[in-house]
UniProtKB/Swiss-Prot annotation:
This protein's name: GTP cyclohydrolase 1
HAMAP family: FolE
Gene Ontology CC entries for this record: cytoplasm
Gene3D superfamilies listed in its UniProt record: 1.10.286.10, 3.30.1130.10
Binding, Zn(2+): C109, H112, C180
Stretches assigned to coiled coil: none
Pathway the protein contributes to: Cofactor biosynthesis; 7,8-dihydroneopterin triphosphate biosynthesis; 7,8-dihydroneopterin triphosphate from GTP: step 1/1
Organism: Aliivibrio salmonicida (strain LFI1238) (Vibrio salmonicida (strain LFI1238))
A biological process term (GO) from this entry: tetrahydrobiopterin biosynthetic process
InterPro entries (UniProt xref): GTP-CH-I_C/QueF (IPR043133), GTP-CH-I_N (IPR043134), GTP_CycHdrlase_I (IPR001474), GTP_CycHdrlase_I_CS (IPR018234), GTP_CycHdrlase_I_dom (IPR020602)
Catalytic function, reaction form: GTP + H2O = 7,8-dihydroneopterin 3'-triphosphate + formate + H(+)
Disulfide topology: none
């Protein structure tokens, strides 16, 4: 029996159908075994880098990294961690834009496994359903907690909300600093990357699109 919620399954299937799911293969390994095996491999990697793991500052580092990967920064790879979603019937007939600004996110670049640090703004036009505001933040965080490219992450959040709300009228914009650009390679400390995903009325109606984009701080 699946440990995934109905919402998690709906979102996952919608992403797979659109070719937007993060590339991953289920391996049937438990969380605890994953942590044990990652710790072993990380111990070998750090030793190859000539670090002395008998030093009291480093001896727990492989364990800490393994726990961080599975339980924290890559926890969004497991749909068992998909947030519990609350939607209610739109009995108040709200039909104006709902926008959540400045949602902080920290993700990890899937190419170099270094930090992506930024903010997202999410909006939707209520139709039949209204979603709990904190659930929007939690959905952003879920998709941030996996190796990512920003373009895909933006689209994943869009499709997740469209699926849960039963409406295409959703918009996302995201601005982030990529440490694969800032701390290595070109070493550009000031640039940021902006991505936008628009659905429904946000895509086809210039006035609605302008209202959304002009309201971003």
């Amino acid at each position: 029996m699946s440990s995934f919620s109905e919402s998690a399954i709906l979102v996952r299937d919608a992403l797979v159908a659109r070719g937007l799911e993060t590339p991953m293969k289920e391996n049937g390994i438990s969380r605890e075994e994953k942590k044990e095996r990652i710790e072993e491999h990380m111990r070998e990697i750090l030793s190859l880098l000539t670090l002395d793991l008998s030093d009291d500052s480093l001896e727990e580092t492989p364990h800490r990294i393994a726990k961080m990967y599975v339980d924290e920064i890559f926890s969004g790879l497991d749909y068992a961690n998909f947030p519990k979603i609350t939607v209610i019937e739109n009995k108040m007939n709200c039909d104006e834009m709902v926008r959540v600004n400045d949602i902080t996110l920290t993700s990890t670049c899937e190419h170099h496994l270094v930090t992506i640090d930024g903010k997202a703004t999410v909006a939707y036009i209520p139709r039949e359903k209204i979603i709990g505001l904190s659930k929007i933040n939690r959905i952003v965080r879920f998709f941030a907690q996996r190796p990512q490219v920003q373009e895909r992450m933006t689209q994943q959040i869009l499709v997740a909300l469209q699926t849960l709300l039963g409406s295409d009228d959703v918009a996302i914009t995201m601005e982030a600093t990529h440490y694969c650009v800032k701390s290595r390679g070109v070493m550009d400390a000031t640039s940021s990357t902006t991505t936008t995903a628009l659905g429904g009325i946000f895509k086809r109606n210039p006035a609605t699109r302008h209202e959304f984009l002009s309201g971003i701080r």
